[in-house]
Amino acid sequence: MVAVGSTLPKVTLWENKPEEVVEFPSQGKFIIVGVPGAFTPPCSSQVPGYIANEKQFAAKGISGIYVVAVNDVFVTKAWKKSFDGGEQSGVHFVADWNGEFTKAFDAGFDASGLLGPLRSKRYAAVVENGKVVKVFIENEVTDVDISSADKVLSSL
């Protein structure tokens, strides 16, 4: 599982459209929020905290927030639009359409019967200069506690 000291996998991720490839910053501090699936109730309750607290995160040195879901880019774009302020927000909604990032980050689980075979565990990771420096992993993927925006923000 993703852990402190982990480096980011070198895989292709997308935002907004298939031609828009996402590259995580190699320098500075940012947050990756791993979610099992766009539009699911727990995920849709977790993400607004990151959008609402974007300025507070920036004040603590966070240069970006990247919500990564094992969904296609059209789904993640629509999900971003579904949030009040989502379109104006600087929070990135990133598609890991084939789960390659999730697998390489060792953050996947089998969600067969509900969401499909591979989904991401729910976590938040603070990354600094390409390495994970803090990680917040939920014990159950339906929980939104340990990886909530408030908990991550208070740890910075």
From Swiss-Prot:
GO terms for biological process: cell redox homeostasis; cellular response to oxidative stress; hydrogen peroxide catabolic process; protein refolding. InterPro entries: PRX5-like, Redoxin, Thioredoxin-like_sf, Thioredoxin_domain. GO terms for cellular component: cytoplasm; cytosol; mitochondrion; nucleus; peroxisome. Transmembrane segments: none annotated. It holds the Pfam family Redoxin. Residues 2-156 form the Thioredoxin domain. GO terms for molecular function: peroxidase activity; unfolded protein binding. CDD domains: PRX5_like. It is found in: Cytoplasm; Nucleus. The active site is at residue 43. Keywords: Antioxidant, Cytoplasm, Disulfide bond, Nucleus, Oxidoreductase, Peroxidase, Redox-active center. Homodimer; disulfide-linked, upon oxidation. Belongs to the peroxiredoxin family. Prx5 subfamily. The active site is a conserved redox-active cysteine residue, the peroxidatic cysteine (C(P)), which makes the nucleophilic attack on the peroxide substrate. The peroxide oxidizes the C(P)-SH to cysteine sulfenic acid (C(P)-SOH), which then reacts with another cysteine residue, the resolving cysteine (C(R)), to form a disulfide bridge. The disulfide is subsequently reduced by an appropriate electron donor to complete the catalytic cycle. In the typical 2-Cys Prx5 family, C(R) is provided by the other dimeric subunit to form an intersubunit disulfide. Pmp20 lacks the resolving cysteine residue. May act as a chaperone rather than a peroxidase. Has no thioredoxin-dependent peroxidase activity. Shows weak chaperone activity. This is Peroxisomal membrane associated protein 20.
